[in-house]
């Protein structure tokens, strides 16, 4: 059953395109917006526009940052361990490790994993950027690259691919410990489990 309002139906269809959002949830969100004050709806509209216009990838680590704030605050941060780079799949994974308050090194965000079935190859993720970063003068301070990808088939494939590229550089490549459920995404793992996985990492 469809609404008689084409505007509401259009909004429902757009919400339903978001990950994890079905039609029923899209309907609830649409009804919520319909009942909100115009000023609140305008704030949401502005936030959606801003995130596309003002957010960029950090020129160093590829994490998200604002235009005019590049490199990002983590890459510029004082007190970070410059000898370690933790390689993750997506920006939410950076937040997950930062919440543990245990890891104080740097990061590199791949923005995906190698997945031939989905048509995603090594050139489609930020592997070249990692290699270029390590070849720069600042990159020569790095003694360990920690592979912290989700324990999926695609994640493991990416870990193996990247580690083979890095080993000739003389950099120690490690992987976070098992204990994270197979198929789980790091952004949904609790801080204690992530801390143990980081502490128990092994050399590849």
Swiss-Prot record:
One of its GO terms (molecular function) is zinc ion binding. Residues 83-181 form the Toprim domain. CDD domains: TOPRIM_recR. A zinc finger (C4-type) spans 58-75. SMART domains: TOPRIM. GO terms for biological process: DNA recombination; DNA repair. Keywords: DNA damage, DNA recombination, DNA repair, Metal-binding, Zinc, Zinc-finger. Pfam families: RecR_C, RecR_HhH, Toprim_4. InterPro entries: DNA_Rcmb_RecR, Rcmb_RecR, TOPRIM_dom, TOPRIM_RecR. Gene3D superfamilies: 3.40.1360.10, 6.10.250.240, RecR Domain 1. Belongs to the RecR family. May play a role in DNA repair. It seems to be involved in an RecBC-independent recombinational process of DNA repair. It may act with RecF and RecO. This is Recombination protein RecR. It comes from Chlorobium phaeobacteroides (strain BS1). The lineage of its organism: Bacteria, Pseudomonadati, Chlorobiota, Chlorobiia, Chlorobiales. The gene is recR.
